[in-house]
């Protein structure tokens, strides 16, 4: 929900930053008020060292246009040190937020989910359930969510049937095999987040890719490509 802007102190995380004019930086922030873009002046100073992802910040922004000015920025807690696959997973979440969240569209519940996900990544908990939960929450917050236990006709999902995803509508039963289908047992497992069911986690990854694809505009995710390149690179 887009909310009227008022200058205030609020928690924030840096999603992305880049140099902007002389010694300034252009920063994309994620806050309870949504994704905000701001100019950080004197970005090479002490405060500028905080302009990096996964650091819990307290920020004061000023300005009425979509491009704000950082009036104050300080650490609000320890940084979440992500490495390896957890680092690429964090980059993936940040890229999803940049690509999909409209500017200044408040999603406080999504922000809290992000806050809870970062330490879980830093603790090297299983990545796939964390990523699927965040993707699902993001889709739901943006109004693109759909039921996993009921099809688009309002009928309960049948564990013995096959279904296809109709983007932004829901799951539709199909007769006969075709690429990209999901079996009902997998869908019911997803609805309960029961990842012990064989194939459920892999099916959830396919489902989220299909659900997100129409909203990414056909452009590949850089974080996903970097991760795939890392996996494919030869090792000594």
Curated annotation (Swiss-Prot):
What are the disulphide bonds in this sequence? none
Which UniProt keywords are listed?
DNA damage, DNA recombination, DNA repair
Can you tell which superkingdom this protein's organism belongs to? Bacteria
A matching Pfam family: RecO_C
Q: Name one GO cellular component term.
A: bacterial nucleoid
Coiled-coil residues are none
Q: Name one GO biological process term.
A: DNA recombination
What HAMAP family does the record tag this protein with? RecO (MF_00201)
What does this chain do?
Answer: Involved in DNA repair and RecF pathway recombination.
PANTHER family membership: DNA REPAIR PROTEIN RECO
Name the family: Belongs to the RecO family.
Name the UniProt record assigns to this protein: DNA repair protein RecO
Q: Which organism is it from?
A: Stutzerimonas stutzeri (strain A1501)
Q: Please state the gene responsible for encoding this protein.
A: recO
């Amino acid at each position: 929900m887009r909310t009227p802007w008022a200058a205030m102190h609020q928690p924030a995380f840096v999603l992305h930053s880049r140099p902007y004019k002389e010694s300034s930086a252009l920063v994309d922030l994620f806050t309870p008020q949504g994704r905000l873009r701001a100019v950080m002046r004197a970005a090479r100073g002490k405060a500028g060292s905080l302009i990096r992802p996964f650091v819990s910040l307290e920020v004061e922004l000023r300005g009425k246009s979509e491009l704000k000015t950082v009036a104050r920025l300080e650490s609000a807690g320890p940084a979440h040190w992500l490495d390896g696959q957890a680092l690429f997973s964090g980059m993936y979440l940040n890229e999803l937020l940049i690509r999909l969240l409209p500017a200044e569209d408040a999603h406080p519940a999504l922000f809290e989910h992000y806050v809870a996900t970062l330490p879980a990544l830093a603790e090297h908990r299983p990545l796939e359930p964390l990523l699927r939960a965040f993707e699902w929450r993001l889709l739901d917050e943006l109004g693109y969510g759909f039921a996993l236990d009921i099809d688009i006709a309002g009928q309960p999902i049948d564990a013995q049937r096959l279904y296809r995803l109709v983007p932004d509508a829901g799951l539709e039963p199909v007769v006969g095999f075709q690429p990209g289908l999901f079996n009902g047992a997998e869908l019911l497992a997803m609805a309960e987040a029961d990842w012990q069911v064989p194939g459920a986690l892999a099916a959830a990854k396919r489902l989220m890719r299909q659900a997100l694809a129409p909203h990414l505009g056909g452009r590949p995710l850089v974080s996903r490509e970097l991760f795939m390149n890392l996996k494919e690179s030869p090792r000594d």
